[in-house]
């Protein structure tokens, strides 16, 4: 059974979780850079970083605390500068270019 805290993205305490697919140093470094860049935008609220346990467990943990968007950084990210955004409520996933990430998340959270 999936436990989900369905808060509006506007009021969710943590808006975004940055989740590298593994603890690979390249992925960790890139993930932390993406987190820092999003934080520096200043309008996206609290952005959590988590690289513990399996990606499935991390998704479930974020669902339980109401995080509306998880951004997954994987080995494709290194090659094509794209990340996966996972939507909490629908569990839909979409690939998006890193350069469009901040604008996309801002639009999703506040519109």
Regions found by a protein language model. Name each.
Residues 1-111:
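NTP/phosphate- and nucleic-acid-binding module
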């Amino acid at each position: 059974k999936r436990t989900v805290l369905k808060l509006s993205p506007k009021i969710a305490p943590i808006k975004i979780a940055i989740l590298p697919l593994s603890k690979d140093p390249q992925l960790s470094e890139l993930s932390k850079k993406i987190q820092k860049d999003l934080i520096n935008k200043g309008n996206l609220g609290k952005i959590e970083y988590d690289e513990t346990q399996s990606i499935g467990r991390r998704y479930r943990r974020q669902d339980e605390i109401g995080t509306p968007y998880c951004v997954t950084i994987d080995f494709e990210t290194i090659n094509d500068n794209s990340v996966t955004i996972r939507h909490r409520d629908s569990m839909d996933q979409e690939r998006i270019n890193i350069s469009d990430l901040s604008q996309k998340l801002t639009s999703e959270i506040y519109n």
